[in-house]
Design a protein with these regions (language model features):
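Conserved acetyl-CoA-binding loop of GNAT-fold acetyltransferases
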Residues: 136-146
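Acetyl-CoA-dependent GNAT
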Residues: 23-25, 34-84, 89-93, 146
Length: 156
């Protein structure tokens, strides 16, 4: 059974795992070392998470184990649109992918952000990433193409 809930403060360190898992690796490409998440352009997603009022995170718990997370914060990241729009990141451990858990996480986060009054949410995704379709189904629209990536926004 899958339970979607807010992350607990003592669990925030798990976002490092999900940040690494969120890195899209095309078929046949060697995964980068885990130390890649220490790079400044990636640390913006997790450093000090929970300290700002616009930091929100939901986790998916399957049989008592955290299987995935979706989180947003207003940050100057790849998905940055403006200083009022939170950027979204989502990731699951590989063994939980393809079961609809990511869709549940995404939809519940969007519902929560609507209730909190956010007018829109943004994200950046590589064009080859299988999650692109999930974002489109959730209402995200491409607002800018950036080489291999697209900047997407969903208006609430």
């Amino acid at each position: 059974m899958t339970v979607i809930r807010e992350i607990r403060s003592e669990e925030i360190s798990v976002l490092d795992d999900f940040l690494y898992e969120a890195i899209f690796i095309p078929k046949g490409v060697e995964p980068p070392p885990r130390s890649i998440i220490e790079q400044e352009d990636l640390q913006v997603y997790v450093r000090g998470f929970g300290e700002e009022p616009h930091d929100h995170c939901l986790v998916a718990e399957v049989d008592g184990k955290i299987a995935g997370a979706v989180w947003v914060r207003i940050m100057n990241d790849y998905g940055h649109v403006d200083d009022q729009t939170p950027s979204l990141a989502i990731s699951l451990y590989p063994e939980y992918r393809g079961q609809g858990i990511g869709t549940q996480l995404l939809n519940q986060m969007l519902d929560m952000l609507r209730r909190k009054g956010y007018p829109q949410v943004s994200l950046s995704v590589q064009k080859e990433n299988y999650a692109l379709r999930m974002y489109q189904k959730a209402g995200f629209e491409t607002v800018e193409e950036r080489g291999e990536e697209v900047l997407m926004v969903v208006r609430m």
